[in-house]
Amino acid sequence: MTPLVVLAVAIAGGLGAVARLVLDGVLRSRAPVSFPLGTTAINVTGSFVLGLVTALALGHGLPPEWRAILGTGFIGGYTTFSTASYEAVRLAQQRQYRAALLTGVGMMFLALGAAGLGLWLGGLAVAPTPPAPSTTL
């Protein structure tokens, strides 16, 4: 891996983190609830985008450098499963057990489903289209 790729991954990670900060701030201001809606939305959308990027990369042979920049860099900076874990523990400590369980387990299933959906849709986008039937004999 070249120094330029490492720099690009770092920049993309910073941009992903800024996108996370902005989206989380917008969601917190619009829906002031104890449930971590922003973190959930970020992790689910990030998982979807990573699934989509992965399928598109595999189907189009995206170079490994670009996979690192987009997946490890941007999406890695954007998603935040450590914050989700912290928020689940925080909710449990506050005796909000249902919200803690929903945050911990629910986010995992939602993120896995979103990643699978992204992989599937990305696979459809790169799947070869069958040739049209011939109308001539």
From Swiss-Prot:
How is it placed in the membrane, per its record? Multi-pass membrane protein
Alphabetized UniProt keyword annotations: Cell membrane, Ion channel, Ion transport, Membrane, Metal-binding, Sodium, Transmembrane, Transmembrane helix, Transport
Q: Name one Pfam family in it.
A: CRCB
Gene Ontology cellular component list = plasma membrane
> Where's it found, cell-wise?
Cell membrane
Identify the main location. Answer: membrane
A GO molecular function annotation here is:
metal ion binding
Sorted alphabetically, the Gene Ontology BP terms of this entry are:
cellular detoxification of fluoride
The free-text function statement in the UniProt record for this protein reads:
Fluoride-specific ion channel. Important for reducing fluoride concentration in the cell, thus reducing its toxicity.
Q: What is the activity regulation comment for this entry?
A: Na(+) is not transported, but it plays an essential structural role and its presence is essential for fluoride channel function.
User: In which domain of life is the source organism classified?
Assistant: Bacteria
Q: Where does Na(+) bind?
A: 76, 79
Q: Which family does it belong to?
A: Belongs to the fluoride channel Fluc/FEX (TC 1.A.43) family.
Protein name according to UniProt:
Fluoride-specific ion channel FluC 1
Q: Which reaction does it catalyse?
A: fluoride(in) = fluoride(out)
User: Membrane-spanning regions, if any?
Assistant: 3-23, 42-62, 69-89, 107-127
